[in-house]
Amino acid sequence: MKQILLLFICISTVTTTSAQQPKFDIKFSEPLAVFVFVQQLSSSYPGNSFKSAFTGSAYDQDKYKDLITRFANLTLSYAYEFPSFPTGSKMPVLTDRLLKKNLIDCNSLEDFKLRSLGLIPNADLIELTNILDAFTRPYNELIYNPNKEKFEKQFKSLSAYFLSKNVSDYFRTGILFYNSAWDNSIPFEIALYPLPDPKGFTAEAFINNAVSAIPTNENNYDGLLSVMMHEIFHMIYNEQSLKVKLNMKNWFDANPSKCSTYAFWLLNEAFATVLGNGYVYERLHGTVDTADWYNQKYINAMAKKLYPIVTEYIAGNKAIDQDFINRYIKIYQDNYSGWLSELNNLLTYRYVVTDNGNDFDTLGFNYPYTSYSDFEDHITESEIRKMTGTPVTKLIIISKERRAELNMVKNSFTELKNWQYLPDKEFTYHTFLKDRTQLIIVNRFKTPIVVLLSKTFKN
């Protein structure tokens, strides 16, 4: 009965939408839900409701623990970039997202395996499929069946709610604002799965899919839809043409503000937040949400400051233009230029080169939030050269061959031409580069890297 019910809802969602409008399919995907379940059970994930249900159950035994470990050791994410696009303006294609898409679209795990051939090595794909097959029964017994009645009622009411709110109108608003494009014959698929946790929901979007966990007691559908639209707006931004991306990057480069590069990096999240959590929420709820829109101070603050300008452009059916970008950068400079000295902001977009691989874990633990992160545990001329061409915060940590490595760094940046340093003393040095990003050089002996950084920058 479950599969028939879900299929009917999915079809009714499509057939009530005209051919001229974007199509939205809503579905439950058991293979995807099992994938998320196993993923959340791995040791790299913090405590969660899936782990609570699994721990102490009949399936909490060596056989399944071994499968969880094997799943965690699989390499599922490979990427290919779009080098003709400005750095950071278009997300790379990631194979783990293609795998998730296939889990949503497949009719069975065997179908998933056939759809996914060539995305990852066959041995890994076969093992992944076998692990998901082994965990289908535990997932149903521990998660789906105990929450089945609540979830299926939620699914029906959510489907009706989505239809009543004309989601396609918000989608078109995003297309116009971002000056992006979408072929309306391609459906946007929304996959929902139950989450036995009352503390909130998660959402993500990729390609033509949005995925959201639904807490079994969730009834704030306005909040849920606004968060899902936030994720969908990311995809609309990602699908801007190369011409639009280059125009936007040129507008940032033409602006003389020292804040322009970091404003560019904040753009994607700030715009999705002001559109989804601000504009869409107000349209659904009738009033602007007075609580935080995003659980990160830089994104939240900028989104709220941008709200009047964004609503002005939406009301005028205007797309982002150079005047909008200049006004956005001015908001950053007038209100938030101090962020250029805050580590939590600077290290959100980071390229780290070090001669000590342990620094990766240390920085990841202390500064976990990143929108762009590159890391290399060898200091070489080729790596420094690559770093100089990447317009993000550049952090170089030297702990070993001090004289040679410091000399290499000095010769790689024109801004360091007159730099004087003492290689036998511990120090942290920083300077603003011509690409309007911070270069941070740490010559470390015994002091922890986080302590050295915090002595120079705000946290």
Q: Where are the model-predicted features located?
A:
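Active-site scaffold of zinc-dependent metalloenzymes
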Residues: 112-118, 171-172, 189-222, 434-456
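Bacterial Sec-dependent N-terminal signal peptides
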Residues: 1-23
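N-terminal mature-domain "stem" immediately C-terminal to a signal peptide or N-terminal signal-anchor/transmembrane
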Residues: 20-106, 300-303, 349-358, 372-374, ...
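Post-HEXXH active-site segment of zinc metalloproteases
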Residues: 239-264
